[in-house]
């Protein structure tokens, strides 16, 4: 059911369910063009500013507990704060594609936000376009040891000035770092050992493209990445 508010403003909405948590979507009044309700895209483009509690257990249309938070907060431009226990009700998520992409008001992220997620394989575009983000915690991916793709995970995060050297230390299964730092225009240097623990990488395509202030690239940056086959547009 679609409910349209007559006047713009702030509304307190309470949602209850006698069974599975319902699939819902929030839309701006003039943007609605039909149901865009897919799994956990609960807050898609919503004007949410803060989240205080963990996401409750959600189920898909087949009654199975969700295993993906793809696009959940995509384009929530007003979202300012994310609790570190946001996903604490889950321990079997496999994908966080575009989860916080273009959440342009987020300035920080807890290093423990993905601590329970040991089965994740994809962080593609998770924080893409979060240009107000000031830093990325060094241990944010520490417990996500099954990840195979960090495609554009923090691309276009133009507020970042530093890349932690051990950011991917525990992600030894990664094969894809394409566009990983693409558009991080304030970063001036790359840590020499940032990819040292990732021997299975095959693609760095566009990894450092559009990094306008990049000055220093270590000579041994890729010394342990002997399986790489894709480096197109690496710095362009």
Q: Where are the predicted features?
A:
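Negatively charged
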Residues: 1-236
């Amino acid at each position: 059911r679609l409910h349209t508010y007559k006047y713009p403003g702030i509304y307190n909405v309470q949602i209850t369910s006698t069974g599975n948590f319902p699939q819902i979507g929030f839309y701006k009044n003039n943007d609605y063009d039909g149901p865009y309700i897919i799994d956990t895209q609960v807050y898609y483009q919503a004007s949410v500013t803060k989240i205080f509690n963990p996401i409750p257990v959600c189920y898909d249309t087949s009654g199975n507990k969700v295993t993906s938070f793809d696009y959940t907060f995509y384009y929530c431009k007003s979202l300012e704060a994310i609790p570190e226990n946001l996903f604490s009700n889950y321990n079997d998520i496999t994908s966080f594609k575009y989860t916080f992409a273009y959440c342009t008001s987020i300035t920080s992220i807890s290093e423990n936000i993905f601590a329970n997620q040991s089965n994740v394989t994809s962080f593609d575009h998770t924080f893409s376009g979060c240009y107000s983000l000031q830093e990325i915690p060094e241990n944010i991916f520490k417990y996500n040891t099954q990840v195979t793709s960090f495609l554009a995970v923090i691309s276009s995060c133009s507020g970042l000035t530093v890349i932690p050297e051990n950011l991917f230390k525990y992600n030894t299964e990664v094969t894809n770092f394409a566009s990983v730092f693409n558009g991080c225009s304030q970063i001036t240097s790359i840590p020499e050992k940032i990819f040292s623990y990732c021997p299975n990488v095959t693609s760095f395509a566009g990894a450092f493209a559009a990094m306008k202030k990049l000055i220093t690239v270590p000579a041994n940056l890729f010394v342990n990445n002997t399986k790489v086959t894709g480096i197109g547009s690496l710095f362009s």
